[in-house]
């Protein structure tokens, strides 16, 4: 039997009595955001809304995005990335578990010097994929062109965020490249590996 999302007490400033809120709402109030699933439009819109709201609420207090994601859709992921760059507060990114595909892209998108991986975290980068097998011939060609543009765009961001040469990033994106936390640090995707 599922227990649902745990509730925790929270006292609003100026109020005597605490109210019970789900743990995620409590953490959001502390500016702690979570991506713990595949990136899709729904989670993308939720995270974007939270980042914008929290930025408006206080534009000097940093945000923390915890990532444990197998990746997901490119466009919703890029929307999260763009929002991270747009909001005034610095966005720390923390990899716990796995940051693969779009998850690693978002991990690299944190404020430089504020990107962290837990010691046993795994990171994976690769090129964007498509559903070519579902497309008609004309659609296939248009989709291939769009996919190449997306790949170039993602590659440029990785080059900028990691400091690696274009040829290294391009070569790495040709296949699934898995990394430990320390390898991700050496690759420039994270700046720090958490220690006990």
From Swiss-Prot:
UniProt-annotated location(s): Plastid, Chloroplast stroma
EC number: 3.4.21.92
Protein name (database record): ATP-dependent Clp protease proteolytic subunit
Molecular function GO labels: ATP-dependent peptidase activity; ATPase binding; serine-type endopeptidase activity
Disulfide bond positions: none
Stated role: Cleaves peptides in various proteins in a process that requires ATP hydrolysis. Has a chymotrypsin-like activity. Plays a major role in the degradation of misfolded proteins.
Residue positions of the active site: 101, 126
A Pfam match: CLP_protease
GO cellular component, one term: chloroplast stroma
Cited InterPro entries: ClpP (IPR001907), ClpP/crotonase-like_dom_sf (IPR029045), ClpP/TepA (IPR023562), ClpP_His_AS (IPR033135), ClpP_Ser_AS (IPR018215)
Alphabetical list of SUPFAM superfamilies matching this protein: ClpP/crotonase
Subunit record text: Component of the chloroplastic Clp protease core complex.
Family: Belongs to the peptidase S14 family.
Keywords, ordered alphabetically: Chloroplast, Hydrolase, Plastid, Protease, Serine protease
Reactions catalysed according to its record: Hydrolysis of proteins to small peptides in the presence of ATP and magnesium. alpha-casein is the usual test substrate. In the absence of ATP, only oligopeptides shorter than five residues are hydrolyzed (such as succinyl-Leu-Tyr-|-NHMec, and Leu-Tyr-Leu-|-Tyr-Trp, in which cleavage of the -Tyr-|-Leu- and -Tyr-|-Trp bonds also occurs)
GO BP terms: protein quality control for misfolded or incompletely synthesized proteins
UniProt KW ATP-binding keyword: no
Entry keyword annotation includes Plastid: yes
């Amino acid at each position: 039997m599922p227990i649902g999302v745990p509730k925790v007490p929270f006292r609003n400033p100026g109020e005597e009595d605490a109210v019970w809120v789900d743990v995620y709402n409590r953490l959001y109030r502390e500016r702690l955001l979570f991506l713990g699933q595949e990136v899709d439009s729904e989670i993308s819109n939720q995270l974007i809304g939270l980042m914008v709201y929290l930025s408006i609420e206080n534009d000097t207090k940093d945000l923390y995005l915890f990532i444990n994601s197998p990746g997901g859709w490119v466009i919703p992921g890029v929307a999260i990335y763009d929002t991270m760059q747009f909001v005034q507060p610095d966005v720390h990114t923390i990899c716990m578990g796995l940051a693969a595909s779009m998850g690693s892209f978002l991990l690299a998108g944190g404020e430089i010097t504020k990107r962290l991986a837990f010691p046993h975290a795994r990171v994976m980068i690769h090129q964007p994929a498509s559903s070519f097998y579902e497309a008609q011939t004309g659609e296939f060609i248009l989709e291939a062109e769009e996919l190449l543009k997306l790949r170039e765009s993602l590659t440029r961001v990785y080059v900028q965020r990691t400091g690696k040469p274009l040829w290294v990033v391009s070569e790495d994106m040709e296949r699934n490249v898995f990394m430990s936390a320390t390898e991700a640090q050496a690759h420039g995707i994270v700046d720090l590996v958490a220690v006990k």
